[in-house]
């Protein structure tokens, strides 16, 4: 488990390139036959990836010990979106088939969660967010057909994109975790511009569907003290509440967003006009 401490905005603006990457970038999300895990002190979110290839992968009791509990989800909820080949997730003996871009919400209290791929040649890639939970909601699979897509932006401003809200109150109940997937239309480069912050929630972005020769310049920092982190395929970035979170790519891309905090009101944002950015 990689533990990341909280950081004050006044400190963050003094960091150089490597300092920013050390604090906020999750560089390696998927490792064959293992789970990766980054624990942030910011709202106690955990992010990572699970890629079973030649064997099943489960999160062992050692994680429970690190969290001060008996097992991983004793006091937590889990959201998973599969960006790879078809796979399965077995929760306390109940097996769920999770295809490409299918998702699974696992409620607090699940003791055994086992991840597997159907075909080792095209392994599943389970990207997950995990947050503290106060009560148990039912484990539920969510497919792309159950998510009402919303298209925003314009080709003229290079920000036409489709937002798919997987784990939001209109789809299913969670304690605090919200997750979704945003896909840019071909030829579009910007996400979340004009940008915003949200004082009441933190957020994590996971960028994927990027060619090897492509990158995204992820914008962060306070609106009047902006910085950037260069992102490559299948990397994640932590965004504190005080930070904007936007990006521009060399080509179109897709990203998964996950939020935890005070509420689950998607539109609860503190908008920032482009003219006010520095």
Curated annotation (Swiss-Prot):
It comes from the Bacteria. The keyword Zinc applies. Its EC number is 5.3.1.17. GO terms for biological process: D-galacturonate catabolic process; D-glucuronate catabolic process; pectin catabolic process. Binds 1 zinc ion per subunit. InterPro entries: KduI (IPR007045), KduI/IolB_isomerase (IPR021120), KduI_N (IPR027449), RmlC-like_jellyroll (IPR014710), RmlC_Cupin_sf (IPR011051). Zn(2+) binds at residues 196, 198, 203, 245. GO terms for molecular function: 4-deoxy-L-threo-5-hexosulose-uronate ketol-isomerase activity; zinc ion binding. Keywords: Isomerase, Metal-binding, Zinc. The keyword Zinc applies. Pathway: Glycan metabolism; pectin degradation; 2-dehydro-3-deoxy-D-gluconate from pectin: step 4/5. It catalyses: 5-dehydro-4-deoxy-D-glucuronate = 3-deoxy-D-glycero-2,5-hexodiulosonate. Gene3D superfamilies: Jelly Rolls, pectin degrading enzyme 5-keto 4- deoxyuronate isomerase, domain 1. Its cofactor is Zn(2+). Belongs to the KduI family. HAMAP family: KduI (MF_00687). Catalyzes the isomerization of 5-dehydro-4-deoxy-D-glucuronate to 3-deoxy-D-glycero-2,5-hexodiulosonate. Homohexamer. This is 4-deoxy-L-threo-5-hexosulose-uronate ketol-isomerase. The gene is kduI.
